[in-house]
Amino acid sequence: MNQAFICDAVRTPFGRYGGALSSVRTDDLGAIPLRALMQRNPKVDWQAITDVIYGCANQAGEDNRNVAHMASLLAGLPLEVPGATVNRLCGSGLDALGTSARAIRSGEAELMIAGGVESMS
């Protein structure tokens, strides 16, 4: 069985309820760490990403229903890179990480992006 490693980590910004980030859509918020990840790792072949998996429990309003894929497109990842959004309430981001690790360990994937994003305002 393959080993899975976390190669880099970027934190989404956070704020207070009704604060400066309250008007930022969840998919736009999710694109911020993806852009930073791409800038910090210029040698990565971004087309080699097997999948982008994001946890998001509150997919409502004008947010895109597949926050992971829309955030990846907004960040500039290739259209061909798929995305999946996991809803496991408070554990959504952790579930996305576990799903990605299992895909790598089982040989289904070689390079994944996993994370979580939420906007409660």
Regions flagged by a language model, labelled:
Residues 1-71, 75:
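Conserved active-site "lid/cap" helical segment
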Residues 10-13, 55-59, 88-92, 116-121:
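Acidic, glycine-rich active-site loops and adjacent beta-strand->loop/helix elements
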Residues 24, 56-110:
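Conserved catalytic cysteine-centered active-site region
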Residues 105-106, 110-121:
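Flexible glycine-/small-residue-enriched beta->alpha junction loops
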